[in-house]
Every structure is written in C-alpha cells, then in structure tokens.
Amino acid sequence: MKRTPVHPVNPHIRNSFVSDFYLNLKRSGRGRLILRMLEHVLGTEINGSLPQRLHLPHPYGILTGSTGKIGEDVTLMHFCLLGPKDPWYQGDSWDNLFPTLEEGVYVSSGAKILGPLTIGAWSVIGANAVVTEDVPPFSTVFGHNRILRTTEGGDPRVRRYLDSRQKAQ
C-alpha cells in the first residue's frame, strides 16, 4: 500500500498488515472466499470504489455504502459508518444516498456519517459524532452536527504536505 507523510507506516501496529491484506484482496477481485471470511471476522464491509491511499489503522466494524465516494489519504477508524440517512427509503435509485469523503478526511471511532452529504477535504470527524449535514474543508465535527470551521487551513503538517505536492507538480 502506498503511504504518505500524513500516514506513515508504524511497525508496532500489526493491524495495518491486516487492513493492507484486506484492501489488496478487495482491489484485486481475487480470493473471494478469503475476502468474505475476513469480512466476517473483522465485521468490516467496504463497498464501492477504493482510493489508492486509504488508511485503516484498526479495520474492525467499518461499514460503507456501495455508492459512497472516498478520497485519497482518508483514515477510517474502527466502528465507523458511512450510510444512508433514511431507513425507509422507497425510491428508484440508490445512487445519491451515501456520503462523499474528500481528500484527507479523518473519521474517528464510532462516527456515523449519514445521508448524501460531502465532508470537505482534511476535515476531522470526532469519536461518536453523528453527521447529517455538509462539512466545509479543514473543519472539525463533534457531537451531533457541531461543526468548528477553521480559516487557517488546518494542521501545519497537512499544509506542508499539500505545499510539497504542489511544488512537485
């Protein structure tokens, strides 16, 4: 798995090997039986398209919708949910029912992101937060839709990383 300075490899966390194995199985499409057994053991079901750089430090209990979009450098902690908002949906299409996570979003453990909304780039979703509204870039969300907006452009490490990417292009 490709790593960035935002998510360096930590040799002391063995779960990253499990998550890398899971993501490689998911991307390759091979080993369906092993993939299903691993999903059953981990309690994780990640559907839809996967980015090249998705970070799952603790790959347990993660559920994502089939049409949700996940950007590069996103971190999903354990027991987070990216799902539809309306449990009694009777419409014709499931195309726009799941959230979109832009680049660099960090979703803490137990967070629920519900509905067809967009989480802005490099935002942080706090533990056990429930998000049902759009979140602007470089914001922090906690509780139930408590959004703290920042105008400084986020963490200095993230700014340095983004600046170095722009210089490389």
PLM features per residue range, with description:
Residues 46:
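C-terminal catalytic lobe of FAD-dependent flavoproteins
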Residues 1-43, 146-169:
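Terminal amphipathic alpha-helical/low-complexity segments used for targeting or macromolecular assembly
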Residues 42, 52-53, 57-60, 65-66, ...:
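Left-handed beta-helix
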